[in-house]
């Protein structure tokens, strides 16, 4: 029968008097200083979903979605945007002990970093096929491809400052292929200890930790 796990963790974060950048132009030069003037209001929700619609199929989704509002009252500046980071995967067990995993991760919306600017959305995807051999599946062969149909993935950072708008474009190498062979030593324990699964959203998207 289908098995579904869903976790939602809403949060609210705010501060007044945070350290923020102050940009100004003097003699055709851009100067940047800091002051304890920045205000932030953030509404955020972390999500984790694991669904097993069939015995050999597992779908996982892990995401962080938020709305940020940065304000600088003295300069009368505000940057209010929404963004999200996600990791999604589909794992399918195939005949001949093969296991196929297709995954995608990235950013949607615009991530704000101060009252002046934000970054654009981006995404990456990958596929992995593996098979185990020998007694107790000690030997594992894995074929991995990251963005096989796109050589690069792109990201932009936008800075708005009055009449000045700066755009910084970045291209990152995404296409990558890998073949790995691993061997496991030791014996598997007959009993399986109960584990607790939690969401661990740091800078790495899709972080899942399991502890005894």
Predicted regions located by residue number:
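Outer membrane beta-barrel strand-and-loop segments of large Gram-negative receptors
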Residues: 1-62, 72-76
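Transmembrane beta-barrel architecture of outer-membrane proteins
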Residues: 12-16, 39-45, 65-69, 82-86, ...
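Gram-negative outer-membrane beta-barrel proteins
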Residues: 2-4, 14-20, 55, 67-73, ...
